[in-house]
Each structure stands twice: as structure tokens, then as C-alpha cells.
Amino acid sequence: MKKNAALALAVTLLAGCAPREVPVEVRIANALPAVTVTALGETEPVGTSAADAADDPAIWRNAANPAASLIVGTDKKAGLHVYTLDGRSRFFIPAGLVNNVDLIETRAGIIVVASDRNDPKESQLALFRLDPAAMTLTSLGKAASGPGEAYGICIDAGASGQDRLTVFAAIKDGSVRQIELTMGTTGPTARIVRTMKLATQIEGCVVDPASRSLFVGEEDVGIWRFAADAGAPVTGTLVAPTDGKQMVADVEGLALVQTGGRSLLVASSQGDNAYTVFGVPVDVAAPLPLLGRFRIAAGRFGATSETDGIEVMLGDFGPDYPEGLFVAQDGENQPLAQNFKLVGWREIRSALGL
């Protein structure tokens, strides 16, 4: 752990020598090359204009009718949208300040969990049920997730059951809390079963079910890997630093897919408007191997920049997305408010030669 801490400190100091005030053109020039793809669709803008508002997407795939799949996206100033793949916002539920979002299918339906930061001193998890036929969200209540301001959230599908969810709550101060959520007749209850701690601000997280690993993005430092099981050690390993080459701070959204018998981790390299794809080695202490980088360039729809949240899911999503769907928040959607861009996984896979 001393070696990891030293590496983290070195990265932090390096970041201090290269502030975000450096022009983005310079950051792009200094980073490793990235191939380009274009969006095949985009969502309607979030309702909050002239602000950093759109934040994080989650995808629900309709196996019976893939083209009828849905995207849940947060307006972190106001609530959650439900989008269809044509980009239209079919429903909005006011929820105030909600940052990240994730979802899972259970016996109780499609459960949506969002990080709720309406109280910056006491984080909460806001729970909803997604009705895919009506394309609506119904509030199921909130559960306390401990002191601090809520930022990231990810569900551990491999450790969740029909009546219980395991989630990781990423708190702005660097705390990562592993929480068991139970759905009762009077609303959800939460029990914190493990707490990890990183030194500075975090947000994005994702669980790899194959290796039972939790990945957490420390924005100015890099991606950390922890064992996901509740009884595992609370120490992690820095496996992908924000070195200005493979990733440029901030590291923001994280997403994971399994394809061809391997796991791929995708990270938003916010500082150079790119996305980095890593392999996930069996050795939990090994650096993540870089598989490639890509950007979403302007085409029929605009480019993306300064992306916060991302999500990717493989499978058939209809004729435009036959191999899978990648959704990315767009931090600059001028002259309109921020939104989410939709890209086919086939195009990303082909461009990177995966």
C-alpha cells in the first residue's frame, strides 16, 4: 500500500503542475492518440439550462423489443429523465440534486438507485421503480448512506438478491461505502457493511462481476481497484493513473462490459474530451492494460466534451445499435442545455480493433 500511496502522491503533484487552465488543445496534443466515432443519436436537453446539469446515464435493455429500450439520465439540479432511444424525454420526476444513477432488474421490478445530495452533510440513496411500459419512474423513498455529500453510485449485481441490493456509494470526500439495501413495506433501509477511503474527490464507480472487483475513479489521481466482497480488505490499488497520457484529469464516469470472455473498463478522460478503454487483468495488483482511446466527433450530431457520466451495455438495441449501446453525457451542447449522446458499440469496437 505504501507504493500505491507514493504513486498516488506523485500523480497528484503532477496534476498540480498541469492545472485545468491549460488549453484543451494542449491537453489533447499531450495525450495519447484517440480514434474518432460519431453519435447515432442524442437525447433532448435536460430541463436545467445554462448550467452544468446533465450528469449520468443508466440503460435498461428491453430483451423482447430491443428498440424499445430506455435510458434513465440525471439532471443533477432537478431530477431524473426517462428517454427512449430516439432521444425523446418521455418522463421526468423531480428529485432535486441527484448525481449518479444505476439500475437493476429484480423480482420487485426494475429498481433505479440515484445518489442524492440534497443534504450536502448527510448523503442519501434515492430509490425509484421504472415501469418500462408506461416509461415512468415511481419514488420508493430514500435511505441514509452516511455523512458527507453524495456523488457516485454503482450497484453490485453479483452480490444483490431478489429482496436485497448491494450498492457502493462514492462520497465527495473520498469515502466509499458498501451498503446493503433492503426493500420493506415502509420504504428502503440501508446498512453500511464496509468503508474504504481515498484521499481526494471521487465520483465514478463500477463493479466487474467476473473478477469481483470494484473500480473507483479518484478524479485527479486515477482509477483504484478494490475487492468487491464485503469481507475483503479495505485497501485498494491504483491501477490506472491520470498521467496526462492515457487519461487526463478529471477521470469521471466508469463503465464495464464483458465480451469474448474478458472484461473491458471504459473511463471518461474528461480533461481531453476522450474515453479510455482498458482490459481487466486477473492480477488485481497489475496495472490495467490500455486497449485504446476514442472521441465522439461531430457528425450528424455534435461532438462530446467534458463528459461526466457514461454507460455501456452490449446486446441488440435495434437496427441502429445491433451490438450494443454507449451513452455519454455531453458537457457542451451549445446553444442548448447539456444532454446525452448515443453511440453504437459496433462503431467503437471497429474503430479500436477490439
Locate predicted features:
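Sec-dependent signal peptide recognition
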Residues: 2-8
